[in-house]
Amino acid sequence: MNLALFDLDHTLLPIDSDYAWGVFTTTIGWTDPVDFNRRNDEFYAHYKAGTLDIHDYVRFATEAVRRRGVAEAHAAHSEFMRSVIEPAIRPEALALVRSHQLAGDMVLIVTATNEFVTRPIAQAFGVGELIAVELARDARDTAAGGSGWITGEIAGVPSAREGKVTRVSQWLQNRDLAWDDVESTFYTDSINDLSLMETVNHPVATNPDARLRAIAETRGWRILDLFPLSST
């Protein structure tokens, strides 16, 4: 089986969806813009430096959503998709995903952004298989058939840095597959994904940051400049 793995932010999207969602919550009045943007910028700087504590970040990033009910949160996300994400989806990225799907490859998006933010984005790309940071949920609404609501904690292994290798390995194991059973390609922009790039058969440095570009050039990895990037 051919397996095509895609990072999301700055790889398929020219923006960071997690960061953009945080900014969006300030525009709709859920968070104080000065305080939120200061903290958001600090976390984003840590992410780019490879020093992010993802557990602390997820508590922060889900704080505004956790104060809202399920219906209000999902309504806000629908507006986020309409006003922020859909205009950012580039035809080049859609065409790249479609080329793998048309070739019969299994396509997965593997992202360090949480599932609440990213599941509708994966659907917008026509990708049904998503590995994202899974969010722990409480018992609210479960008696009525609901899935509970976000607690701010992470469920299972976060799909960040080396955790991406673990999560993809688990995905394969759940299908009675191993890495040796698949011909794997991984597209990413970030040095944070170096472990997964070193695991797959065909790493593709896509819109790479300076450090990843240097490594890709040294190792002879393919470099793909898919589109110009936003600064966030």
Predicted regions span which residues?
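Active-site phosphate-binding/coordination module
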Residues: I15-V23, V70, E134, P158
